[in-house]
Each structure stands twice: as C-alpha cells, then as structure tokens.
Amino acid sequence: MKYRKKPIVVEVIRWTGDNGKEIEAFCGADVMFGTIYEPDPVSAACIHTLEGKMYARPGDYIIKGVNGELYPCKPDVFAKTYEAVEE
C-alpha cells in the first residue's frame, strides 16, 4: 500500500549554530546545546523527541509537529517535503 501525507501546517525554525536564544524560545525545555564529535567537533542542539534524544546540526531544521512534538530534519529532506505557506 502507498500513503500520502495529509496536508498540515507545522512550525519550523532553522538552527544556524548562532541562534540559541530563538531555538530555546521555540523548543522550551526540550533542547540543550553542546558539541558532538563526528570526528571533528560540531556545534549541536540536542532535542528531546518522542523517539529520544536527537541532534540538530547547523543548517538543520527543527520542526514542531501537530501535537507539539519536536524533531530535527536535514535540509535536503525538508526541501523535498515542505513548502512555505502564506500567513
């Protein structure tokens, strides 16, 4: 079987590595900042998601789902899945 996503509107913020205050305002207590090593050090936002901790790297989007759940999304996947809406 195949399924299509229902057309929903989600809130999104992009993690730049420099916008920690905006990310904190968007995510609330569900985010922490630090460095991960892969193997070089990279600034990261650690997000508490429904599946556990996930990391957003600079350039990634953080999406707030329909029930307020948070999850990171890589830019290429975001571009294929979402489009801007007029407010």
Q: What feature does the model see in each segment?
A:
Residues 1-43, 49-50:
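N-terminal domain-onset segments
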Residues 51-87:
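Short, compact, well-ordered microdomains
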